[in-house]
UniProtKB/Swiss-Prot annotation:
Record comment regarding domains: Avian ovomucoid consists of three homologous, tandem Kazal family inhibitory domains.
Gene Ontology MF: a single term: serine-type endopeptidase inhibitor activity
InterPro entries on file: Bifunctional_prot_inhibitor (IPR051597), Kazal_dom (IPR002350), Kazal_dom_sf (IPR036058), Prot_inh_Kazal-m (IPR001239)
Species name: Phalacrocorax sulcirostris
Domain Kazal-like intervals: 4-54
Protein name stated in the entry: Ovomucoid
Superkingdom assignment: Eukaryota
């Protein structure tokens, strides 16, 4: 199972780095920061489906 450590998030600003991750909501997030901010917003209900685009 793919995991991402989001303990340092949420962050106010994310970089434009492009390293896509696919969330359990079938949405592609452009990088770890954007994904982890979404995880924080979801109160932990969002998880990582896999690395790369959905």
């Amino acid at each position: 199972i793919a995991t991402v450590d989001c303990s340092d998030y949420p962050k106010p600003v994310c970089s434009l780095e492009y390293m896509p991750l696919c969330g359990s909501d079938s949405k592609t997030y452009s990088n770890k920061c954007n994904f982890c901010n979404a995880v924080a917003d979801s109160n932990g209900t969002l998880t990582l489906s896999h690395f790369g685009k959905c």
